[in-house]
Amino acid sequence: MGSQVHLLSFLLLWISDTRAETTLTQSPAFMSATPGDKVNISCKASQDIDDDMNWYQQKPGEAAIFIIQEATTLVPGIPPRFSGSGYGTDFTLTINNIESEDAAYYFCLQHDNFP
């Protein structure tokens, strides 16, 4: 029986300003995968945000790391099995050939709003 990779994506709400609030909704909230699987995590914005979407990975007890910028650009040093797609309101983080070391929380965030 193969080992499983447990991934947790979570909803992160961020208010961009008082004139235009953007809500980001991720799905699924939790998933299990077997090493070698392909995994997709969806992030939907409540309004058009062009390509202003970043993805982050956070392992338990560690700081979040930046993995995808502006929806599709892989951050240097991140393995190429990670990729991002989307524009406007619908975005996807894809992990191809997932590995056990990829077990983590994943979250999307409109890039103009990272503290």
From Swiss-Prot:
Annotated stretches, region: Framework-1: 21-43
Region (Complementarity-determining-2) residue spans: 70-76
Subcellular location: Secreted; Cell membrane
Residue stretches making up the Ig-like domain: 22-115
Region Complementarity-determining-3: start-end pairs: 109-115
GO molecular function: antigen binding
One GO process term, biological-process aspect: adaptive immune response
Region described as Framework-2: 55-69
Disulfide bonds: 43-108
Annotated glycosylation sites: 40
Pfam families given in the database record: V-set
Stored Gene3D superfamilies: Immunoglobulins (2.60.40.10)
SUPFAM superfamilies: Immunoglobulin
Keyword Glycoprotein: yes
InterPro entries for this protein: Ig-like_dom, Ig-like_dom_sf, Ig-like_fold, Ig_V-set, IgV_Light_Chain
The protein's role, per its UniProt record: V region of the variable domain of immunoglobulin light chains that participates in the antigen recognition. Immunoglobulins, also known as antibodies, are membrane-bound or secreted glycoproteins produced by B lymphocytes. In the recognition phase of humoral immunity, the membrane-bound immunoglobulins serve as receptors which, upon binding of a specific antigen, trigger the clonal expansion and differentiation of B lymphocytes into immunoglobulins-secreting plasma cells.
Protein name: Immunoglobulin kappa variable 5-2
Species assigned in the record: Homo sapiens (Human)
